[in-house]
Amino acid sequence: MAALVVTEPGRALLRAGTERLLRGGIQELLRPRHEGNSPGLARDFSLSQNRGTVIVERWWKVPLAGEGRKPRLHRRHRVYKLVEDTKHRPKENLELILTQSVENIGVRGDLVSVRKSLGRNALLPQGLAVYASPENKKLFEEEKSLRQEGKLEKLQTKAGEVTVKFLKSCRLEVGMKNNVKWELNPEIVARHFFKNLGVVVAPHTLKLPEEPITRWGEYWCEVTVNGLDTIRVPMSVVNFEKPKTKRYKYWLAQQTAKRMAPTSPQI
């Protein structure tokens, strides 16, 4: 079957527009339509170009004609089947290298694949990214190796930026028991970060107030993410009201029994 490429011009609209232009109706075509006017029988002529292309193929094969003669076409030879509609073809993404940290996309030096509209209308004009050419890839690879060697300042990772943003909106609650004397330390705070907020925090990245915390109340703690950004998180030290260990449940039962037991009168 022979392939045939046909455009989408709208021949009837083009013929009608040409006639109106020949009659001097160019001003009428350029005049904007008022809101509320219902379109008439004749459709408006569009001056914009339609660049869509549809690739079709004949359903019936045209027989070969004799030498010097045109092939004889029947009505069945004007039946086509769709091969591809380039207007609705899936659009390819654009590969870029970020020059700065962009929220929800990446950090400097990351090779990202974004929509062409986002790259050409936002990232490239604002200088947030460059094209992923071989020269630019080599340049950022050298910069990355220098950062790993410690010759350049380190940058926060994408996961680190997400962690910093999350910690800025958090409040930590630390539950402490009332049956023993206690003093809050970084190990206890780190466990409550994972238990209550789901964030893994190393104890050496935590900083508590200089005065020892031995009572319930409102305090703060500072968390350093990847050694770059430090966030102060509000912290509430409250009474531990939901016992889970058998030892603490046994102690609570003993205290309740002592309060409920009748006291014998002294003689």
UniProtKB/Swiss-Prot annotation:
Keywords: Mitochondrion, Ribonucleoprotein, Ribosomal protein, Transit peptide
Keyword Transmembrane helix attached: no
Subunit details: Component of the mitochondrial ribosome large subunit (39S) which comprises a 16S rRNA and about 50 distinct proteins.
Primary subcellular site in the record, as a coarse category: mitochondrion
SUPFAM superfamilies: L9 N-domain-like
Source organism (scientific name): Papio anubis (Olive baboon)
Protein name according to UniProt: Large ribosomal subunit protein bL9m
Transit peptide: 1-52
Lineage: Eukaryota, Metazoa, Chordata, Craniata, Vertebrata
Keyword Ribosomal protein in annotation: yes
Record gene name: MRPL9
PANTHER family: 50S RIBOSOMAL PROTEIN L9
Similarity annotation: Belongs to the bacterial ribosomal protein bL9 family.
Listed InterPro entries: MRP-L9_N, Ribosomal_bL9, Ribosomal_bL9/RNase_H1_N, Ribosomal_bL9_N, Ribosomal_bL9_N_sf, Ribosomal_bL9m_C
Localization terms from the record: Mitochondrion
GO MF: structural constituent of ribosome
A GO-annotated cellular component: mitochondrial large ribosomal subunit
GO terms classed as biological process: translation
